[in-house]
């Protein structure tokens, strides 16, 4: 079985890593659109366009299922993709919501994500349907900090403090959704700043959503494609995955031409 995944950059590799721990035999094709990262500050229409191009690329790799390893796309383009393609397409938002519902005892949940994810209100609407009080905050600098390999630095710590200082005073919140697949890479800094809050990530929670779709069979291959490959990209892939990979380049213009 072949799983396709895509994200705006390297953050979706946190999803790939979680999936690979459970499904060690499947074949995985990953596309990171590093030439156009971040998606979270772009319009819904642009996100849909980019998402269609990425999904179409994966379809052409003969994948059996697509995991949208990006909250901005899951929030703004999943319905459009499901209408366009016939194979199963799974986003990360529902998994994050389910994890938060299991985690929270106070029924007060914080959500952090890109501007596109927070402004979509998808997390808020899903949680409020279960009578959960939500507190949402966009953290647009977190993705560039990760993509620039500034993890666990003074810069990342200052950004965490800048964006999350209001959560320090919201004593009822016991759970914080990391509503972007890049954000688990800042988990150490976030946990140090908010030690009293449980952090949940859709990158881990997605496993329960694909159990009925994915069969653990294949040749255990992993192909990593990126629309821009810099030294940072290679180093981040090794940092996240714990090993080196042969990264493959895809021209971003070819994505549009073949869609």
From Swiss-Prot:
Residue sites binding substrate per the record:
7-8, 39-40, 71-72, 181-182
EC number(s): the record gives 5.1.1.3
State the active site: 70 (proton donor/acceptor), 180 (proton donor/acceptor)
| GO annotation terms (biological process) | cell wall organization; peptidoglycan biosynthetic process; regulation of cell shape
Q: Pfam families attached here?
A: Asp_Glu_race
Q: Which UniProt keywords apply?
A: Cell shape, Cell wall biogenesis/degradation, Isomerase, Peptidoglycan synthesis
- Please give the catalytic activity noted in the UniProt record: L-glutamate = D-glutamate
Cross-referenced SUPFAM superfamilies, in alphabetical order?
Answer: Aspartate/glutamate racemase (SSF53681)
Identify its protein family.
Answer: Belongs to the aspartate/glutamate racemases family.
**What is the recorded function of this protein according to its Swiss-Prot or TrEMBL entry?**
Provides the (R)-glutamate required for cell wall biosynthesis.
Report what the protein is called: Glutamate racemase
**What organism does the UniProt record list as the source?**
Hydrogenobaculum sp. (strain Y04AAS1)
């Amino acid at each position: 079985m072949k799983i396709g995944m895509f994200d705006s950059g390297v953050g979706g590799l946190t999803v790939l890593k979680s999936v690979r721990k459970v499904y060690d035999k499947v074949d995985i094709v990953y596309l990171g659109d590093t030439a156009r990262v971040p998606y979270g500050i772009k319009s819904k229409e642009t996100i849909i366009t980019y998402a269609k191009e990425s999904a179409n690329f994966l379809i052409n790799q003969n994948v059996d299922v697509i995991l949208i390893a990006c909250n901005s796309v899951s929030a703004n383009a999943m319905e459009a993709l499901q209408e366009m393609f016939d194979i199963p397409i799974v986003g990360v938002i529902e998994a994050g919501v389910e994890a938060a519902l299991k985690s929270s005892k106070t029924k007060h949940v914080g959500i952090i994500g890109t501007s596109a994810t927070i402004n979509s209100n998808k997390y808020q609407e899903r949680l409020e349907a279960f009578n959960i009080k939500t507190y949402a905050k966009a953290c647009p600098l977190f993705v560039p900090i990760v993509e620039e390999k500034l993890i666990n630095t003074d810069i990342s710590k200052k950004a965490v403090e800048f964006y999350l200082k209001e959560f320090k005073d919201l004593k009822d919140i016991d759970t914080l959704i990391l509503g972007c697949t890049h954000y688990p890479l800042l988990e150490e800094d976030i946990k140090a700043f908010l030690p009293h809050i449980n952090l949940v990530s859709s990158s881990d929670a997605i496993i329960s959503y694909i159990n009925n779709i994915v069969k653990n069979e294949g040749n255990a291959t992993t192909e990593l494609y990126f629309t821009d490959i810099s030294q940072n990209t290679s180093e981040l892939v090794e940092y996240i995955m714990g090993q080196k990979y042969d990264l493959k380049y895809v021209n971003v213009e070819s994505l549009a031409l073949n869609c």
